[in-house]
């Protein structure tokens, strides 16, 4: 009984020190990585898929041919003047994302360096005059380039960065950037 009396205040003190999970309830989820890292250094937040509609600068056929997968759905972000486009596979998973940024040169370069960090990516200079990087990731590949105040970044679920590069070049051409 004496142990119980001494143990009760210790338990009460420890209970106030951390999160509590009660059996049979959902555990609290940690903050998402996009919340913490997407706005690092004052960069615009990562785009989020919104309305289901055609991408205004890339057709589904172009993406299907470049990425080698059928496109079942396209969603676009609310970003303006150029929304990010999310292309989905038939199983409902994103196969390719294209983000276009037009603003100031420092932010454009920072977005490219965030997507394809200088120290871990291969240099990219295609199309002519654009600079950035490409790399394979655990989920596929990224190709990201900037020129002046514009940046175009493509992420694919395919390991070959040439697929993302092809889409970036098509987007740049369609938008006349």
Whereabouts are the PLM-identified features?
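Short, solvent-exposed recognition patches
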Residues: 70-129
């Amino acid at each position: 009984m004496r142990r119980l009396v001494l143990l009760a205040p210790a338990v009460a003190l420890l209970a106030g020190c951390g999160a509590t999970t009660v059996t049979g309830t959902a555990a609290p989820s940690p903050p998402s990585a996009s919340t913490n890292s997407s706005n690092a250094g004052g960069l615009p937040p990562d785009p989020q898929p919104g309305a289901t509609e055609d991408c205004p600068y890339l057709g589904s056929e172009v993406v299907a041919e470049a990425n080698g997968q059928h496109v079942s759905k396209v969603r676009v972000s609310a970003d303006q003047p150029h929304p990010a486009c999310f292309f989905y596979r038939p199983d409902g998973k994103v196969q390719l994302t294209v983000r276009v940024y037009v603003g100031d040169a420092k932010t454009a370069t920072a977005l490219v360096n965030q997507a394809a960090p200088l120290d871990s990516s291969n240099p990219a200079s295609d199309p002519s005059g654009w600079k950035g990087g490409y790399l394979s990731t655990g989920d596929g590949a990224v190709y990201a380039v900037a020129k002046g105040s514009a940046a175009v970044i493509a992420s694919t679920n395919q390991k070959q960065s040439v697929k993302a590069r092809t889409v970036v070049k098509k987007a740049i051409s369609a938008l006349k950037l």
